[in-house]
Swiss-Prot record:
ATP binds at V40, G41, R42, G43, K44, Y45, S46, E47, V48, K63. The active site is at D151. It comes from the Eukaryota. Its EC number is 2.7.11.1. Keywords: ATP-binding, Kinase, Nucleotide-binding, Serine/threonine-protein kinase, Transferase. This is Casein kinase II subunit alpha. It comes from Zea mays. Pfam families: Pkinase (PF00069). InterPro entries: CK2_alpha (IPR045216), Kinase-like_dom_sf (IPR011009), Prot_kinase_dom (IPR000719), Protein_kinase_ATP_BS (IPR017441), Ser/Thr_kinase_AS (IPR008271). Tetramer of two alpha and two beta chains (possible).
């Protein structure tokens, strides 16, 4: 059995009410308090709008959920309620539903986001350090509260660059961590799926989020989005193996006694490890430093137990400047 290196017993030690989302009784607010202004996005499970609270004229985000199991909606609500007020976690303000269709909507705080495809290419070396550090605060917080996000990717990280404000959003795939529990491997978005998901290791943990963060970070520093560009789940593992090498993959599979299905094994083939510096070029060299490479190398590990935890990541030399700036601000 594989078990998280940190925060493994959070839900064991908390009362059942904390993690038993199926028992949640939803307190519905008043739908007429909110009006849709414009559509800002759509996902597999929802449509997202900029809205307005007509009582105080404040902007908000309205996430109208597509028909999905009641249990899944309750899970998302319970997790958002448990995490509310945590650093850089999007705030759930209200839950409403349509009187006739019974379609539920989640009302969130408004964040003025710049699309990452536009924003990321403009970010400086320091900006990347700053925003990854802000994202780590959100991840360490949710992990410390016994919750894995399971869908970390640029689309789910809202950045208001003018205010230098970051929010981790879309908790629809998030789940409570219970040691030894076997989870669905059909989570996360393909380019950000950890090796554990791609080889069907089900007793994964918070460290899945650290792989996804590593993919996101690699994309940012090497200006290569997405960093691992697989065409399907099998090809995704192939793309990872072509960078990390197949020797490490085999060590990982043997350690956890995992057998790849023969078709996937044939596809993966044999590859040597590609040094990180091979991804450096004239366009990205100003973002690639020895500390950045060292940090990346400690995230993108096949073995989920070897990856840095979010808290360990925050102490990495890569963030030294960010920590120093934060300390001088708190002292000021």
């Amino acid at each position: 059995m594989s078990k998280a290196r940190v925060y493994a017993d959070v839900n064991v030690l908390r009362p059942k009410e904390y993690w038993d989302y199926e028992a949640l009784t939803v307190q519905w607010g008043e739908q007429d308090d909110y009006e849709v202004v414009r559509k800002v996005g759509r996902g597999k499970y929802s449509e997202v709008f900029e809205g307005i609270n007509v009582n105080n004229n404040e902007k908000c985000i309205i996430k109208i959920l597509k028909p999905v199991k009641k249990k899944k909606i309750k899970r998302e609500i319970k997790i958002l309620q448990n995490l509310c007020g945590g650093p850089n976690i999007v705030k759930l303000l209200d839950i409403v539903r349509d009187q006739h269709s019974k379609t539920p909507s989640l009302i969130f705080e408004y964040v003025n986001n710049t699309d990452f495809k536009v924003l990321y290419p403009t970010l400086t070396d320091y900006d990347i350090r700053y925003y990854i550090y802000e994202l780590l605060k959100a991840l360490d917080y949710c992990h410390s509260q016994g919750i894995m996000h399971r869908d970390v990717k640029p689309h789910n990280v809202m950045i208001d660059h003018e205010l230098r404000k970051l929010r981790l959003i879309d908790w629809g795939l998030a789940e409570f961590y219970h040691p030894g529990k076997e989870y669905n491997v059909r989570v996360a978005s393909r380019y950000f799926k950890g090796p554990e998901l791609l080889v069907d290791l089900q007793d994964y943990d918070y460290s899945l989020d650290m792989w996804s963060l590593g993919c996101m970070f690699a994309g940012m520093i090497f200006r290569k989005e997405p960093f691992f560009y697989g065409h399907d789940n099998h090809d995704q593992l192939v793309k990872i193996a072509k960078v990390l090498g197949t020797d490490g993959l085999n060590v990982y599979l043997n350690k956890y006694r995992i057998e790849l299905d023969p078709q996937l094994e044939a596809l993966v083939g044999r590859h040597s490890r590609k040094p990180w510096l091979k991804f450096m070029n004239a366009d990205n060299q100003h973002l690639v430093s020895p500390e950045a490479i060292d940090f990346l190398d400690k995230l993108l590990r096949y073995d989920h137990q070897e990856r840095l935890t979010a808290l360990e990541a925050m102490t990495h030399p890569y963030f030294q400047q960010v920590r120093a700036a934060e300390n001088s601000r708190t002292r000021a």
